[in-house]
Regions:
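Polyanion-binding surface elements
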Residues: 9-31
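Major-groove DNA-recognition helix of helix-turn-helix-type DNA-binding domains
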Residues: 25-65
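Short, Lys/Arg-enriched anionic-surface-contact patches
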Residues: 1-5
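Short, functionally important structural connectors and interaction interfaces within domains
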Residues: 7-8, 47
Length: 66
């Protein structure tokens, strides 16, 4: 059985936080939360489970223009 801390580290390394998204896009944290919410809605429509305030790095990098 895996250690819960190891599982969290693995999951966290696959997600961006709103603060990280704000830095990447050069926007405020509020705007980053808004964009994460919009992107998470797309993922939910495709049947994925999402975490509020976080976004998959892979999905974000595919969708972001930078």
């Amino acid at each position: 059985m895996e250690n819960k801390n190891t599982e969290n580290i693995s999951l966290e390394s696959k997600l961006y936080t709103a603060e990280e998204v704000a830095t990447i896009l050069g926007v405020s944290k509020t705007t980053a939360y808004r964009e994460i919410k919009r992107l998470n809605a797309e993922l939910e429509a495709q049947g994925y489970i999402t975490i509020t305030g976080k976004i998959s790095k892979r999905f974000f990098n595919e969708r972001a223009y930078f």
